[in-house]
């Protein structure tokens, strides 16, 4: 990808989800992954097992305070969007990519905190047609990242 695209993983529980997100990030050309909160890093063997080496091709950085990171990126003129179902979220199919761009994804159960959501430029969701309320964080991240490539 020729444009700067960043990914912020906040409080993701599963090392396997993190590893799979690294593989997807490599596939779409993510410039850097910021790993926030208690999200496992590639130093965790489960992350490395699932990422199949993508942790070596995608730059990453551990960053404990995600809301401060959002503010820091925005101060550098990087648009920051969240992938989260909320009362203010919009259908991801309407998303128009503008770079540089950072995408924040959160915990598999709790999602993103209001402290983060109030700081992002916009919030987007993937509509669900079945009985389940959401997709797995890795799947949702992949869907949204490929939308960004359009």
What positions do the PLM features span?
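Active-site/ligand-binding-proximal alpha/beta "capping" segment
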Residues: 85-127
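Short, acidic/turn-prone active-site loops that include or flank metal/cofactor-
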Residues: 38-40, 108-110, 128-132
